[in-house]
Amino acid sequence: MPDEAMRRRRFLGGVAAAPLASAAQPRPTESKMPLAIGCDHAGFPLKGPVIALLKSWGHTVRDCGTFSEDPVDFPDIAKKVCDEVLAGRAQRGILVCGTGVGACIAGNKVRGIRAALCHDTYSAHQCVEHDDVNLLCMGAWIIGPKVAEEVLSAYLNARFSTSEEFRRRVRKLGEMEKQ
């Protein structure tokens, strides 16, 4: 393994993990798109900075709630964001809850939504490129504003691959939804 590749390799619990990401700064997204965002009470502190960032990048953002730290049920907010995506009013959606897990589960219950939980940039672009993900879920207790910025940049700059192997797989996911 070349020295640079070895330097970038990490080990977690003695097992080789993904290479460290490059130090490149997140870049504003190249194409502007309408987005829908929502959060529960646990995600509320991160939602405001995320909305400000997305608007600074030129996106239009529809805020589907919640609007305070008062407890709410995340499936209700997830449904609102998913409805925006499915109706075409948003090209992609973003959900923020405590860990992101509940939001991802809720999103994947909605036919036509492909949700992914992403706390790193590789997953954030790969899920769009290979799986045509249209709903990004993040955990406010897991990542802070800076990592969220990097994840959002990767997610929003990614495009679904034109390769037939990935398109075939996404079609199969659609068929599974019909069963």
Q: Which residues make up each language-model segment?
A:
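N-terminal secretory signal peptides and thylakoid transit peptides that target proteins
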Residues: M1-A18
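C-terminal segment of N-terminal export signals and the immediately downstream linker at the start
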Residues: S22-G38, P49
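Glycine-rich phosphate/diphosphate-binding loop of Rossmann-like nucleotide-binding domains
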Residues: C39, G43-K55
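A short beta-strand-loop structural module common to alpha/beta enzyme folds
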Residues: T60-P71
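Short, structured active-site "lid" loops
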Residues: I77-L95
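Alpha-helix C-terminal capping segments
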Residues: E84-R89, C104-G112, V128-D132
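Compact, glycine-rich, soluble single-domain proteins
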Residues: L95-C118
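C-terminal binding/interaction regions
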Residues: Y122-Q179
